[in-house]
UniProtKB/Swiss-Prot annotation:
InterPro entries the UniProt entry points to: HPr(Ser)_kin/Pase, Hpr_kin/Pase_C, Hpr_kin/Pase_Hpr_N, P-loop_NTPase, Ser_kin/Pase_Hpr-like_N_sf
Protein name: HPr kinase/phosphorylase
Native species: Thermoanaerobacter pseudethanolicus (strain ATCC 33223 / 39E) (Clostridium thermohydrosulfuricum)
Residue numbers binding Mg(2+): S160, E202
EC number: 2.7.11.-, 2.7.4.-
Subunit structure: Homohexamer.
GO MF annotations in UniProt: ATP binding; magnesium ion binding; phosphorelay sensor kinase activity; protein serine/threonine kinase activity; protein serine/threonine/tyrosine kinase activity
Residues annotated for ATP binding in this entry: G153, E154, S155, G156, I157, G158, K159, S160
This protein's UniProt keywords: ATP-binding, Carbohydrate metabolism, Kinase, Magnesium, Metal-binding, Multifunctional enzyme, Nucleotide-binding, Serine/threonine-protein kinase, Transferase
């Protein structure tokens, strides 16, 4: 999503509407915020008006000391800029001059009971998630031992069946068939399911299953960071498959690299157990231990002797 209507922000963060913008609504396009203390003192160089504006206790204390005519002039100048909204924290009093200026320029004036720091943190996290670059891919996403495992492969390769077996073994489904991937930071991806198919899984020969109803709320989750990608493919006798794990492979989504494993599929292989072990091995690597490297060191040491 590249922009958020202020109405959505009001609903999701439970904000009180003091003045509603009716004909001059401006969407939010950045997760950055601005505290306009300098603007109410008359300084407008480098004013980031495109951001959500937030006034807390410090700014309110300064504003309370301004004469009525001075505040009216400064509020009029402030709301003349195309700001998405002004939010007052701590349920603080809002002077009439600010309300009048917001009404005159048809800008949103909002209020929250939360303290400034707590609210700003919540707001930035919310905006980062909503405004994150996003793509949708075909696959399954499962929480395996706290590792977000994205299963990829051709249709019919067994992604959904593997996910179902993992759920039966106590792991949690995030998404089946369609995975929405969001870039939540420079090096992190988060996956989720489209709302309409959330918690559902399709198994050929059976149909649609409601995992939340069948296995309980502990078998699903709404979103998960993507830590590991497992590509399932038909076993190819002529293709070389890594048997040691000394070399790392990666795949890119939204310019973020994610570790990738390619698992060949053939009758008799228990894919769910392989995925479990892959997730545990990935966690072990995150903790600084690589079994393949340790074995390689031992072999080199033995050869050296």
């Amino acid at each position: 999503m590249d922009k958020i209507p202020v109405e959505t922000l009001i609903k999701d963060l439970n904000l009180e509407v003091i003045v509603e913008a009716k004909n001059n609504k401006i969407d939010i396009t950045t997760s950055d915020v601005n505290r306009p203390g300098l603007q109410f003192s008359g300084f407008y160089e480098h004013f980031a008006y495109e951001r959500v504006q937030i006034i807390g206790k410090v700014e309110t204390t300064f504003i309370e000391q301004l004469p009525d005519d001075v505040l009216a002039e400064r509020a009029d100048r402030f709301f003349n800029y195309p700001i998405p909204c002004l939010i007052v924290t701590r349920d603080l009093n809002i002077r009439q001059e600010i309300i009048d200026a917001a009404q005159k320029h048809d800008r949103y004036l909002l209020r929250t009971k939360e303290a400034s720091t707590k609210f700003i943190n919540r707001l930035i996290n919310y905006l980062d998630e909503k405004l994150a670059p996003q793509i949708t891919i075909h696959g399954d996403l499962v929480d395996v031992y706290g590792i977000g495992v994205l299963l990829l492969g051709e249709s019919g390769i067994g992604k959904s069946e593997t996910a179902l077996e993992l759920i039966k073994r106590g792991h949690r489904l995030v998404a089946d068939d369609a995975v929405e991937i969001s870039k939540i930071s420079e090096d992190k991806l988060q996956g989720s399911s489209p709302e309409i198919i959330r918690h559902f899984i399709e198994i050929r020969g059976i149909g649609i299953l409601d995992i939340k109803t069948l296995y309980g709320v502990g078998s699903v989750r709404n979103s998960m960071n993507i830590d590991l990608v497992i590509q399932l493919e038909e076993w190819d006798e002529d293709k070389y498959y890594d048997r040691l794990g000394l070399e790392d492979d990666y795949i890119k989504f939204l310019d973020v690299k994610v570790p990738k494993l390619t698992i060949p599929v053939r009758p008799g292989r228990n894919l769910a157990i392989i995925v479990e072990v892959a997730a545990m091995n990935h966690r072990q690597k995150q903790m600084g231990y690589n079994a393949a490297h340790e074995l390689n060191k031992k072999l080199l040491k033995q050869i050296g002797n």
